[in-house]
Design a protein with these regions (language model features):
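Short linear regulatory motifs enriched in tryptophan with gly/pro/ser
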Residues: 1-115
C-alpha cells in the first residue's frame, strides 16, 4: 500500500443516546498520535485528557514514565498502516479521558487509493 492510500473509518461514541459518530478519511500512513488529533478535531474536543487506542490486546498512547508501570506503546512511533497490517483488524477501540471513560468503536470501512 502506498503513501497515497486513504482509509475511510467510522468512529462512534459508545453508550451515548442518541448515536454520536463521525465518518473520516485519513492517510493510511498517518501516525497514531496524529490520528488521535484528528479524532479530537472531529468531535470538537480540547485534547485535555489521557487517551489510548487498542487493537485487540495491544494499546497505543503517549507513555508517561511518572505512572511507574508499563503503559501503552508509543503512538508517535506507529502508523495506522503498520498496526492494521500487524493485527489484521478492521476494528479498534479509542478511549478518551480515563476518568470519564469515553469509549469509542472505530470501524475501517474502506481502504482506497487517493484520488
Amino acid at each position: 500500500m502506498s503513501n497515497g492510500t486513504v482509509v475511510r473509518m467510522k468512529i462512534t461514541l459508545d453508550d451515548v443516546p442518541p448515536i454520536v459518530s463521525r465518518t473520516l478519511e485519513v492517510p493510511l500512513n498517518i501516525r497514531l498520535d496524529r490520528l488521535h488529533t484528528v479524532f479530537q478535531t472531529a468531535f470538537s474536543w480540547t485534547d485535555s485528557h489521557l487517551w489510548e487506542m487498542s487493537f485487540g490486546q495491544t494499546g497505543f498512547g503517549i507513555p508517561d514514565p511518572e505512572y511507574g508501570f508499563d503503559g501503552p506503546l508509543d503512538a508517535r512511533k506507529a502508523t495506522l498502516a503498520q498496526v492494521l497490517a500487524d493485527t489484521r483488524r478492521k476494528t479498534f477501540r479509542y478511549l478518551y479521558d480515563f476518568g470519564d471513560a469515553w469509549e469509542h468503536s472505530v470501524k475501517i470501512e474502506r481502504v482506497t487509493a487517493a484520488s
